[in-house]
Amino acid sequence: MFQNNPLLSQLKQQLHDSKPHVEGVVKGTDKAYGFLETEKETFFIAPPAMKKVMHGDKIKAAIETIGDKKQAEPEELIEPMLTRFIAKVRFNKDKKLQVLVDHPNINQPIGAAQAKTVKQELKEGDWVVATLKTHPLRDDRFFYAQIAEFICSAEDEFAPWWVTLARHEQSRYPVQGQEVYSMLDTETRRDLTALHFVTIDSENTQDMDDALYIEPVTAPNDEQTGWKLAVAIADPTAYIALDSQIEKDARKRCFTNYLPGFNIPMLPRELSDELCSLMENETRAALVCRLETDMQGEIVGEPEFILAQVQSKAKLAYNNVSDYLEQVENAWQPENESTQQQINWLHQFALVRINWRKKHGLLFKEKPDYSFVLADNGHVREIKAEYRRIANQIVEESMIIANICCAHYLAKNAQTGIFNTHVGFDKKFLPNAHNFLMANLSNEENQQELAERYSVENLATLAGYCRMRHDIEPIEGDYLEFRLRRFLTFAEFKSELAPHFGLGLTGYATWTSPIRKYSDMVNHRLIKACLANRECVKPSDETLARLQEARKQNRMVERDIADWLYCRYLADKVESNPEFRAEVQDCMRGGLRVQLLENGASVFVPASSIHPNKDEIQVNTDELALYINGERRYKIGDIVNIRLTEVKEETRSLIGNLV
């Protein structure tokens, strides 16, 4: 009687339409139920309804009121959490193939089929790439996936690398090379092989793309008036045609990927590590910048760019050069007087330039780099905190001044290029930055002066931003630096000259690593076009966008692999509840995120372990500080002692408690 009754259908539709509808994102839990988070509130999703959705799905749901509680009934899929994803192979009790999504908040197994292109015989725990084919809300069928790619076996010790690269859709292989390479540049090169160029790199570096030669500038009375520096940079574009496959692959990769233990080069290894590498006593094609400074490190006159042949006379290592300059006992010594002279002069020049940048630009605060020392099987033997020593600073200062010269040379002669830019504070956060500085630095005496000094208008200028950074530099601790960092915008690649607030410079364009960075290859081609009086083609928006995207991807790959390796390294140490000094990186409602100073690992400290009553914990998002009963206990930049209590390799997370 009631079947196909139009009145009943109409009544049902009216009842449905009368219910409020919301859009939101599904939040899974480790129980069968979940939640729908909307902009304004959070709704309960009952276990039967959770079977139709997955953590992270963006959905439309009807809101039903049951008793005095509201709950969401999922109705429509707006955007699935999963499309392409990383998973582990699983076989259920009936030996049916399933996949377990590699995500900390998704724990339901998904039925799967193997694509015909995947030839491997899959075993429990193998790593794969899968795509979601059906979704209950969209297709009226259960979740179902197709395995599209085999990554590695469950036993592969290098899974952290291969899985992470697959997740971010990056190749684990170098770019394919050519059978032969020939010199494509027809211009005459100046012979600079007599100059005593030296390279300073890590001991094991093969892709050496910069060599340095320096001499003092003297007046007729033999008094020194400045420095003359030649920066020779490897010239891969001399061998790579613009329409070649190597160029296309480099444009896609954008950077050499430096991973714990090894790198994946942007160019074929026979170019990056051999033909273009500025190897000791080998004549190499190079693009050279010759520049002069006065005794204070100020650039004098116009820098000169030339195509040249150079020959590195010494392959030097950072630690050896630093030991020698710091007069460490039994330190390495230069092989001959010419090399010794170059090291000493480069040292003097670097100190002058550091001083110049301190006054006229901005210096980065010293923070260590953490490097993983691996055994052949990929196991982490140790993690070293490496500080930049004087030899690193020599190379850094030489590269920075060369990149400043490149920016202004391209702006003047090519009217375009790939420029590294940074505009400081995000416009929308300028008032926040002003208020924060006033709250932390002003008092009754200086309030009027600082209100002007740190006005929104002044903070938006390069000079005003640099002045503010110089003001806070002597202040003890990292709190101001860390908090202000959250108000900054991201660095960007642009095709016109623009300031780089982070460096405190009016212009910056890198060209000193063409073996490792595609942007530097582009700038090489533009410098060469200027030298040959050819047309300079503006880099496309697509190239700039790809550089931005690739830089972000590479950082995520490096971070994800490191998180995994930290878990492996600390897994067998957690039983002894080791204690570490750590720096607070973030304060959240759920707890603190801290970084271990000894090895750089990121550890989460749950709020429940800090204070038993969560209602008495408040987080001040303006200060990025955690309060207990109205009293500020922790803020970003604080140094705390923590005890490591848990290592979860499956989610790549470390848990600790405050001591």
From Swiss-Prot:
It is an enzyme of class 3 (hydrolase). Its main location: cytoplasm. PROSITE patterns: RIBONUCLEASE_II, S1. One of its GO terms (cellular component) is cytosol. It is found in: Cytoplasm. SMART domains: CSP, RNB, S1. Residues 577-659 form the S1 motif domain. One of its GO terms (biological process) is mRNA catabolic process. SUPFAM superfamilies: Nucleic acid-binding proteins. Its EC number is 3.1.13.1. One of its GO terms (molecular function) is RNA binding. This is Exoribonuclease 2. The gene is rnb. It comes from Mannheimia succiniciproducens (strain KCTC 0769BP / MBEL55E). PANTHER family: EXORIBONUCLEASE 2, RIBONUCLEASE. Involved in mRNA degradation. Hydrolyzes single-stranded polyribonucleotides processively in the 3' to 5' direction. It comes from the Bacteria. Coiled coil: none annotated. Pfam families: OB_RNB, RNB, S1. The keyword Magnesium does not apply. It catalyses: Exonucleolytic cleavage in the 3'- to 5'-direction to yield nucleoside 5'-phosphates. Residues 189-532 form the RNB domain. Keywords: Cytoplasm, Exonuclease, Hydrolase, Nuclease, RNA-binding. Belongs to the RNR ribonuclease family. RNase II subfamily.
